[in-house]
UniProtKB/Swiss-Prot annotation:
UniProt keyword list: ATP-binding, Glutamine amidotransferase, GMP biosynthesis, Ligase, Nucleotide-binding, Purine biosynthesis
Domain GMPS ATP-PPase: residue ranges: 206-395
UniProt domain Glutamine amidotransferase type-1: residue ranges: 12-205
Pathway info: Purine metabolism; GMP biosynthesis; GMP from XMP (L-Gln route): step 1/1
HAMAP family documented for this protein: GMP_synthase (MF_00344)
Name of this chain's protein: GMP synthase [glutamine-hydrolyzing]
Gene expressing this chain: guaA
GO molecular function: ATP binding; GMP synthase activity
Residues the record lists as binding ATP: 233-239
Disulfide bridge partners, by residue number: none
Function: Catalyzes the synthesis of GMP from XMP.
Pfam families recorded: GATase (PF00117), GMP_synt_C (PF00958), NAD_synthase (PF02540)
Length: 520
C-alpha cells in the first residue's frame, strides 16, 4: 500500500465519508491549519485506523437517517481507540445512536432545521474556545438528537435542536449538529481549528513542501523502474503533474500532448514552448483533431461528448504507447473536486469528469493520479513550490474535453471559432484590467442560441456568447464575479466587433450551487 497516510511521520486527521457533497471541505479546512487531512470510507475498521495512526477523526455529514435499512454505520471499536473524534451532523447522530443515546426521526416534534440558525452555548468547551456564546451556524438536518449517551453533556442548543453540540471529554468524543466546514457557520473555522490544534494536538507544520516529498516517495515506490505516460492538456493540473513526475522519475516520463482540435487559441504552441522548452519535459505532440471532431459530429448530449472524448483520448494513448516500450502507467491531473462531482460510494454523480469514469474498461494502463487529494488552489501552491512560473501556475483552468463542453449542442468548426476567439478576448481584457488573480475562473460559452441583431444596415441571425466568471476558494462552491461594468462593456464590444457569427453577449450570474462552473 502506497497511500500518503502510510507515512507515519506526518500528522494527519482522517475524515470518514458519510456522503455529504461538502465533506471534502472538512479536509480542506483542516489543511488550512497546516494539518494533513484526507477522506476515508466509512467502512474502515478500527484496526485499519490504528495502522494509519491519525491524531484525530472526523465523522462527516450525510443524507441518510441512522434508522434507514441501508444506513452507513461505523466500527464501534473506533470509539475505543482513544483518538479524538468529532461527529458533524449525521456524524453526531451516529455517535449518539451507536453509544446508546436517542435520535428522533425526521418529522417528529418539529426538529428539522435548514439554513442559518443561532447556536447558544450552555457550557464551556475547548471545541468552542474563543467563540461567542451565541453564534450563527448552518443547520441542514431532519433527524435530531433528543437524548445524549451516558458520559456526554450538553454544550449547545438552538431553537429547534435540544442538543446542537455535545461532548464526552473523558473519551474525547465531540458532536455538533451543524456544519462548521461551510462559510455560513461564522465561527466554523475556529471550531475546526480548536479540534485540530487544541484537542488533537496538531503541530500545524504540514505544507506543500511536505506534500512534494511524500508524493515523490509514493510515485517512486509505485513506479519503480517502469515508465509513465502523461497526457498534457495545456491546463494547470496536467502541467503541475508533469513537473512533479519529472522531479520524481526523470526520463521514465513521456508526455503526450494530444491536440484534439478543441484547444484554446495558440494553446498547442504555448504548451510545447513552456513545458518542452523551458522545463525540458519529453513531449510527443499528436495532431488528432480530425479523429476527435469526426467522432463528435452530430453529438449534442454533454455526457456523450465527455465519454467520447475520454475514450478516444485513451485510444490515442494506446496508439502512441504501442510505439514505445514498457509503458505501464497513465498519469492524470484528477483533483478532489473531480472525484466528488463524479460521485463516490456515498455521493451521487453531478457529472462525469474526463479524469473520473470517462475511461474505457479495456484500458491497458494502470492509473497514477498525484493530485487527487488536492483542491485547485492547493495545486497552484504546489506549482509555485515546484518552482513553476506564475504564467503557468495561474493559467486559467481548462478541462480535458476542452472547448467541447463550452459549446452547447453539436460541435461545428464555426462554433469552435466563436468560442476560441471570444475566450482569447476575454482573457486578454481581464488581464489588462488587473483582475486575473481576483477572478478564480473565466471563459466564454457558445450557448447554441441564435438571435436577431442589426450590424451596419443589415439584419443578422447569429450566436449568443455567454461570459462565465466566478470567484471561489477551492472550486466546491463559487459566486459569480462582479466584474466592473466598464470591463464587461469593453469585452462585449470587442467580441461582437471582432468575432464572426456573434451578435449578442450575456453574462452568467449563477452561483455554484445550483449551477456547476462549466456549462456542460
Amino acid at each position: 500500500m502506497t497511500e500518503i497516510s502510510m507515512l507515519n511521520d506526518v500528522q494527519k486527521i482522517i475524515v470518514l465519508d458519510y456522503g455529504s457533497q461538502y465533506n471534502q471541505l472538512i479536509a480542506r479546512r483542516i489543511r488550512e491549519f497546516g494539518v494533513f487531512s484526507e477522506l476515508k470510507s466509512h467502512n474502515i475498521t478500527a484496526q485499519e485506523l490504528r495502522d494509519i495512526n491519525p491524531i484525530g477523526i472526523v465523522l462527516s455529514g450525510g443524507p441518510n437517517s441512522v434508522y434507514a435499512d441501508d444506513a452507513f454505520g461505523i466500527d464501534p471499536e473506533i470509539f475505543e481507540l482513544g483518538i479524538p473524534i468529532l461527529g458533524i451532523c449525521y456524524g453526531m447522530q451516529l455517535i449518539t445512536h451507536t453509544l446508546g443515546g436517542k435520535v428522533v426521526p425526521a418529522g417528529q416534534a418539529g426538529h428539522r432545521e435548514y439554513g442559518q440558525s443561532s447556536l447558544r452555548l450552555r457550557s464551556a468547551s475547548a471545541l468552542f474556545a474563543g467563540t461567542p456564546d451565541e453564534q450563527l451556524v448552518l443547520m441542514s438536518h431532519g433527524d435530531a438528537v433528543t437524548e445524549i449517551p451516558e458520559g456526554f453533556h450538553l454544550v449547545g442548543d438552538s431553537n429547534d435542536c435540544p442538543y446542537a453540540a455535545m461532548e464526552n471529554t473523558k473519551k474525547r468524543l465531540y458532536g455538533i449538529q451543524f456544519h462548521p466546514e461551510v462559510r455560513h457557520s461564522v465561527y466554523g473555522n475556529d471550531i475546526l481549528k480548536n479540534f485540530a490544534i487544541s484537542i488533537c494536538g496538531a503541530r500545524g507544520d504540514w505544507s506543500m513542501d511536505n506534500f512534494i516529498d511524500m508524493e515523490i516517495a509514493k510515485i517512486r515506490k509505485t513506479v519503480g523502474d517502469r515508465k509513465v505516460l502523461l497526457g498534457l492538456s495545456g491546463g494547470v493540473d496536467s502541467s503541475v503533474v508533469g513537473v512533479l513526475l519529472q522531479k520524481a522519475i526523470g526520463d521514465q516520463l513521456t508526455c503526450i500532448f494530444v491536440d484534439h482540435g478543441l484547444l484554446r487559441k495558440n494553446e498547442g504552441d504555448q504548451v510545447m514552448e513552456m513545458l518542452g522548452g523551458r522545463f525540458g519535459l519529453n513531449i510527443i505532440r499528436v495532431d488528432a483533431s480530425k479523429r476527435f471532431l469526426d467522432l463528435l459530429a452530430g453529438v449534442e448530449d454533454p455526457e456523450k461528448k465527455r465519454k467520447i472524448i475520454g475514450n478516444e483520448f485513451v485510444y490515442v494513448f494506446d496508439d502512441e504507447a504501442s510505439k514505445l516500450e514498457g509503458v505501464d502507467f497513465l498519469a492524470q491531473g484528477t483533483l478532489y473536486t473531480d472525484i466528488i462531482e463524479s460521485g463516490t460510494e456515498t455521493a451521487q454523480t453531478i457529472k462525469s469528469h474526463h479524469n473520473v469514469g470517462g475511461l474505457p474498461e479495456d484500458m491497458q494502463f494502470e492509473l497514477i493520479e498525484p493530485l487527487n487529494t488536492l483542491f485547485k488552489d492547493e495545486v497552484r501552491a504546489l506549482g509555485t513550490a515546484l518552482g513553476m512560473p506564475d504564467e503557468v501556475v495561474w493559467r486559467q483552468p481548462f478541462p480535458g474535453p476542452g472547448l467541447a463542453i463550452r459549446i452547447m449542442g453539436e460541435i461545428t468548426a464555426e462554433k469552435l471559432e466563436t468560442v476560441r476567439e471570444s475566450d482569447a478576448i476575454l482573457r486578454e481584457e481581464i488581464a489588462k484590467a488587473g483582475l486575473d488573480r481576483d477572478v478564480w475562473q473565466y471563459f466564454t460559452v457558445n450557448t447554441g442560441v441564435r438571435s436577431v441583431g442589426v450590424m451596419g444596415d443589415g439584419r443578422t441571425y447569429d450566436y449568443t456568447i455567454a461570459i462565465r466568471a466566478i470567484t471561489s476558494i477551492d472550486g466546491m462552491t463559487a459566486d459569480f464575479a462582479q466584474l466592473p461594468w466598464e470591463v464587461l462593456k469593453k469585452i462585449s464590444v470587442r467580441i461582437v466587433n471582432e468575432v464572426d457569427h456573434v451578435n449578442r453577449i450575456v453574462y452568467d450570474i449563477t452561483s455554484k450551487p445550483p449551477a456547476t462552473v462549466e456549462w456542460e
